[in-house]
Regions:
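Short amphipathic helix-loop junctions that connect adjacent transmembrane helices
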Residues: 10-27
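Loop-to-transmembrane helix entry/capping segments in MFS-fold secondary transporters
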Residues: 24-25, 113-123
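Helix-to-loop junctions at the C-terminal end of transmembrane segments
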Residues: 40-54, 142
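Cytoplasmic membrane-interface "Motif A"-like loop-to-helix N-cap segments
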Residues: 51-64
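C-terminal ends and interior cores of transmembrane alpha-helices
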Residues: 63-79
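Hydrophobic core of transmembrane alpha-helices in multi-pass small-molecule transporters
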Residues: 82-98
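Intracellular juxtamembrane helix-capping segments at the cytosolic ends
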Residues: 98-111
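A membrane-interface helix-boundary motif in multi-pass transporters
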Residues: 140-158
Length: 171
């Protein structure tokens, strides 16, 4: 699911400009607001994680990232596309911080104590090694069809991540 986040970070603004007609000023304001909501989400979900556990927060954040991406996808077909995209963005921003922090926290919980450096190093390496996949898929689908169809690649990464994460929880 991290490739989906990387793609959103890299291409979300381009989607907003190209598909929804956002101005550069609107993108700048959106970026600032998203960062504020990411900080708030991290803070609030830090307390929630203490109550319900890291796995549930990750699961919830992934479901909300799917909802957010779906809203961004359908926004051009609504009566208020920019408003729907803003809602999508605020939801995404709120969930990004908890998703990333809880994912690292969960990893720290499940790996052997004496192997933490190796596992986190491998985690960083694989994240960098595959970080091109989301933007590549987005670009390929955009070239063939449209930016909206390109955005579906992000949805695919989030859904696959959600499925894999829940398969891991079953074991």
């Amino acid at each position: 699911y991290n490739d989906g986040l990387i793609t959103i970070f890299a291409l979300g603004g381009i989607y907003a400009i190209g598909t929804l007609g956002f101005s550069m000023k609107e993108i700048l304001v959106l970026g600032i607001v998203l960062n504020i909501f990411a900080a708030l989400g991290s803070f609030i979900f830090g307390y929630i994680e203490d109550k319900i556990g890291v796995k549930r927060v990750i699961n919830f954040s992934l479901v909300m990232l799917v909802v957010s991406t779906t809203l961004a996808f359908i926004s051009p077909w609504t009566s208020y596309p920019k408003v729907i995209f803003w809602i999508s963005g605020v939801l995404l921003g709120t969930m990004v911080g908890p998703n990333q922090s809880c994912s690292r926290s969960y990893m720290a919980q499940i790996i052997p104590e004496n192997k933490k450096n190796e596992f986190f190093g491998f985690y960083a390496f694989t994240g960098k090694a595959t970080s091109f996949l989301g933007p590549l898929m987005f670009g390929f689908l955009t070239k063939l069809y449209s930016q909206q169809i390109g955005l579906l690649s992000v949805l695919v990464f989030f859904v696959i991540g959600l499925i894999i994460f829940n398969k891991k929880l079953e074991k």
